[in-house]
Amino acid sequence: MKKGIELFKSEIYTGKKTTEFEKTVGLKLPVLFKYFCEMFELGQECFLNAKRSFDDILLPITSVNYVDLKENINLRISHFYELKELQSRWKEDIEFSEWFKTRNLLPIAYEEINLGQIFISLSQNDFGNIWYIGGYENDKPIYLSKNIFEFASKLVETEINDEDFKNKQVYKNWGEDFWRVKE
């Protein structure tokens, strides 16, 4: 199973995505977060987690979790938001409400179990720190890490319990990047 940054699809660094985002949205991003956004593919398919073919659809057989055993935190991360998506939604989406903007929290990833979000702080006193806020009204911010790479280092690939197949029943054909289930 993969862990840390080996879970991400890499991209060629250009520096253009973050520069355009900062100009359009009017926010200054932390340097390490800029590198992260430029080095790795973001969006719905950002992770290299294992998938299987099911009726011509690729379904994940593993999930990506943020795990901090010391703090007893385990969050299933669905995906990281693409900068273009954030850029277009920042000023108009209720999901990115004034509450987050006034606290200088930029949503960067979606947590799928509690419908929460992972945020990066843009405020001076904790610039670049990573926080989690659950999807419920009274959920309080939870500190996760001091920067995006420390956060990414705690990501691990874990198996999804699926009654349709057992792991011993899967195989890959040469050149395929997904698993097939033996019939």
Model-derived segments and their meaning:
Residues 1-113, 179-183:
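A surface-exposed partner-binding patch
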Residues 105-106, 118, 131, 142:
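A broad, low-specificity signal marking well-ordered, structured residues that form hydrophobic/aromatic
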Residues 109-111, 123, 133-135:
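Structured loops at beta-to-helix junctions and adjacent beta-edge loops in soluble globular domains
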Residues 114-116, 138:
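Short acidic/polar mixed-charge low-complexity motifs
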Residues 116-123:
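Short, surface-exposed beta-strand/loop micro-motifs that present aromatic residues
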Residues 127:
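A short alpha->loop->secondary-structure connector
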Residues 131-162:
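Compact, glycine/acidic-enriched structural inserts
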Residues 150-183:
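Acidic, proline/glycine-rich low-complexity IDRs
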